[in-house]
Amino acid sequence: MSQFKRQRINPLPGGRNFSGAASTSLLGPPPGLLTPPVATDLSQNARHLQSGEKQRVFTGIVTSLHDYFGVVDEEVFFQLSVVKGRLPQLGEKVLVKAAYNPGQAVPWNAVKVQTLSNQPLLKSPAPPLLHVAALGQKQGILGAQPQLIFQPHRIPPLFPQKPLSLFQTSHTLHLSHLNRFPARGPHGRLDQGRSDDYDSKKRKQRAGGEPWGAKKPRHDLSPYRVHLTPYTVDSPTCDFLELQRRYRSLLVPSDFLSVHLSWLSAFPLGQPFSLHHPSRIQVSSEKEAAPDTGAEPSPEDSDPTYSSKVLLLSSPGLEEFYRCCMLFVDDMAEPRETPEHPLKQLKFLLGRKEEEAVLVGGEWSPSLDGLDPQADPQVLVRTAIRCAQAQTGIDLSTCTKWWRFAEFQYLQPGPPRQLHTVVVYLPDVWTIMPTLEEWEALCQQKATEAAPQPHEASGEAEATEQAPDVSEQADTSKQNTETMEATTQQDVDTDLPEAPPPPLEPAVMARPRCVNLSLYGIVEDRRPKERISFEVVVLAELFVEMLQRDFGYRIYKTLLSLPEKVVSPPEPEKEEAAKEDAVKEEEAVKEEAVKVSKDEVQNEGTAAESDSPLKEDGLLPKRPSSGGEEEEKARGEAAEDLCEMALDPDLLLLRDDGEDEFAGAKLEETEVRSVASNQSEMEYSSLQDMPKELDPSTVLPLDCLLAFVFFDANWCGYLHRRDLERVLLTLGIRLSAEQAKQLVSRVVAQNICQYRSLQYSRAEVLDDGLPEDVLFGNLDLLPPSGKSTKPGAAPTEHKGLVPHNGSLINVGSLLQRAEQQDSGRLYLENKIHTLELKLEESHNRFSATEVTNKTLAAEMQELRARLAEAEETARTAERQKNQLQRQMQDFRRRLTPLHLEMQRIVEKADSWVEKEEPTPSN
């Protein structure tokens, strides 16, 4: 080292020194007593490397080589012991991983150096004529390199240049086996002190003859995430503390008392909420005039003691959900765009109050709605109809069902104290949807009204010119106000376009001041642009919990109908060997975990803190605690070991000595994956060889596929065993952990349910063959609660026979038949709509074919005319040719005698000349 300090390294032959202001080197301060030339113009890729990290990976030129050490680019010192492969020669290109230590005399020291194989012929440093470096270039790391005499295009560059990053993710790094331990930190940096461990592991791997996984292309997978609450969704009441426990990011008002979850009795497990009917609600544009409904928005005798509000649900219908799910299942070989999640397709129509999205509804009016809301349930329904018509322009009076979804209670302080109750209804909006004929007539009427009329326009222009100035100012202020409102709506609501066109299918049109917000935008969006009220957020969470319970119960009934999986007992010798291998692997993992550096520990802590809000809200699965779930750990020891191996960022083996050790040493910040993302990559590679232990003849219903898709937030195509067990445990039917494990084992292989590879059919699975005590879990074994009602028991108010015109009518049976007929009607309407689209497409094709035929016919006529013209031109040319030929023959006949006459004259002249010449004398 002292020799290196005293020695002044000469630059590479052929280089030039330039004077100027010294700038900081790309890799930090230069080594002590060295005066390397510093690059002044850094490329875009070089600027990307200035991120302040302690290690860099780059390619450079060996500028000095001695007995025990060398120098790369006159800045990076390396010992010959860190060279992998053959020793580099002076002037050769090498791949270097350097570490920065400001405490040493030479700050930049190489950790690994590798000579690049198959290098093209470099310039010889002796002849100066081959040096073609530009005058403004200086040598340094990633600066000017010696020019190549031969630069064939078939040799790709080592690091492809991109506008945003210098290093591209290598395609040689794969996670194709669960027993391939990663040895890189959470940010993709290789640990300097563990290079020997890498080499020893690789040598053992190769010596043992263990085959490497098949080389597969890297997939940009979405992180695995599930829509799942960490609590049971059967609590009938939530107070202040319960809301804070469930939704930690929710701001609860100070006057809030409690909320009663009425949807538990309105939609029991046996009669869940149906998404079968499409109900489309669209907000009209600002240009359309709102119809005068005649309803009073705020009467004088309004009483805040009772308020009635409605949840106006906009849903595409069950057939559209099935279509998206089947597209996702059918596109396994050639994946296309990921369809929208059901939470993004389900939307609520909300009103606005001081630029805040609020529920549609208002306070109770005794004079307009009724006198006693407690005794007469129709009073608050009238309030909801009146307020909804005044705020949205939608008439809900023809809705046939009004379900109580929730009841909010607020305490008004002051003498005397008052209890304010807000009742939220969920009406069947699909019953007020216009039919196809009505919708077509409405669209035609709007198109006729929107057509410009020149006579009326001119008359309006004349009237505007004769109007007084006061009316002009009033119109201007009104237009400015409407423009400001429209601008605010565009800035706040991201779901609505600037001027939404009328939908192709029937829809209910609402007023412009309303807004459509999806459940995903309310519940999942962590940075909402919309100011949402407290009640809207709570109702959205409750609606998602209701869907979670219904879809989870659908999975539960499907699992009950599947045959049990027969598990053969393991042999004692193999079991003992497997236990010994597991103990050895655990010890190896613990030893590797102890060697993790402080930087990696801090980075892991940061990643864990960033994921903690998601885990608290139930968006990411939490690891089981060591104290409270010892039995669950004992049952799923193998599954937890695999998950820990997938989550550990320090257990990765690289495939090649030369390429893979440097290929992923510096990853882009955007490609640094979270714990869930790394886990999804590990599982995706293992899913390809997963044995399908389910009976191939087993066909699941489509609603089960929709249930799987609902819980799979990012369309990964699979669900974990632990998440499926939690889905069953949160239904409220009091299953034990062992029961949930046995049910989930019917569709799980290797701790993962790959639901995308299962078979599905439209035929629904009948639940008649399942006994009631099995359908409702262990509720019959538990002591009855205060209300003593099963969640699957339907309300008994309308049961029995009803006399009508001297006969008894079974109302329940009639309603069931009406539901079946309505379902068939909706299915046929969907098929008719699909056939109409296909017919329209065929019509368009036929029209395009006709246009093409006409174009081809016109072109053929034009070609025929051109052909006739060419034939006429050919005939004219033939006539001219014949005429010229005759003239040439005539000229020949005339010129032949002249030629003979001239020849005779020449001969006669020659004879005369010969006679006149004197004879020579002797």
Swiss-Prot record:
Keywords: Acetylation, Activator, Apoptosis, Biological rhythms, Cell cycle, Coiled coil, Cytoplasm, Cytoskeleton, DNA damage, Isopeptide bond, Metalloenzyme inhibitor, Methylation, mRNA processing, mRNA splicing, Nucleus, Phosphoprotein, Repressor, Transcription, Transcription regulation, Tumor suppressor, Ubl conjugation, Wnt signaling pathway. Residues 1-39, 178-219, 280-307, 446-508, 567-638 are annotated as: Disordered. The modification Omega-N-methylarginine is found at residue 180. SMART domains: DBC1. Acetylation at Lys-112 and Lys-215 by KAT8 prevents inhibitory binding to SIRT1 and increases its deacetylase activity. Genotoxic stress induces its sumoylation and sumoylation promotes the SIRT1-CCAR2 interaction which in turn inhibits SIRT1-mediated deacetylation of p53/TP53. Sumoylation leads to transcriptional activation of p53/TP53 by sequestering SIRT1 from p53/TP53. Desumoylated by SENP1. The keyword Phosphoprotein applies. GO terms for molecular function: enzyme inhibitor activity; RNA polymerase II complex binding. There is a cross-link at residue 590 (Glycyl lysine isopeptide (Lys-Gly) (interchain with G-Cter in SUMO2 and SUMO3)). It is found in: Nucleus; Cytoplasm; Cytoplasm, Cytoskeleton, Spindle. InterPro entries: BURAN, CCAR1/CCAR2, DBC1/CARP1_inactive_NUDIX_dom, EF-hand-dom_pair, LAIKA, S1-like_RNA-bd_dom. Residues 473-491 have a biased composition (Polar residues). There is a cross-link at residue 590 (Glycyl lysine isopeptide (Lys-Gly) (interchain with G-Cter in SUMO2)). GO terms for cellular component: chromatin; cytoplasm; DBIRD complex; mitochondrial matrix; nucleoplasm; nucleus; spindle. Disruption phenotype: Mice mimic a fasted state and therefore, display an increased production of glucose. Display elevated levels of PCK1 and are glucose-intolerant in both a normal and a high-fat diet. Mice develop more tumors including lymphomas, liver tumors, lung tumors. The modification N6-methyllysine is found at residue 123. Component of the DBIRD complex. Interacts with ZNF326/ZIRD; the interaction is direct. Interacts (via N-terminus) with SIRT1, which inhibits the deacetylation of substrates. Interacts (via N-terminus) with SUV39H1; this interaction abolishes the interaction with SIRT1. Component of a nuclear receptor-mediated transcription complex composed of at least ZNF335, CCAR2 and EMSY; the complex stimulates the transcription of nuclear receptor target genes such as SOX9 and HOXA1. Within the complex interacts with EMSY and interacts with ZNF335 (via C-terminus). Core component of the DBIRD complex, a multiprotein complex that acts at the interface between core mRNP particles and RNA polymerase II (RNAPII) and integrates transcript elongation with the regulation of alternative splicing: the DBIRD complex affects local transcript elongation rates and alternative splicing of a large set of exons embedded in (A + T)-rich DNA regions. Inhibits SIRT1 deacetylase activity leading to increasing levels of p53/TP53 acetylation and p53-mediated apoptosis. Inhibits SUV39H1 methyltransferase activity. This is Cell cycle and apoptosis regulator protein 2. It comes from Mus musculus.
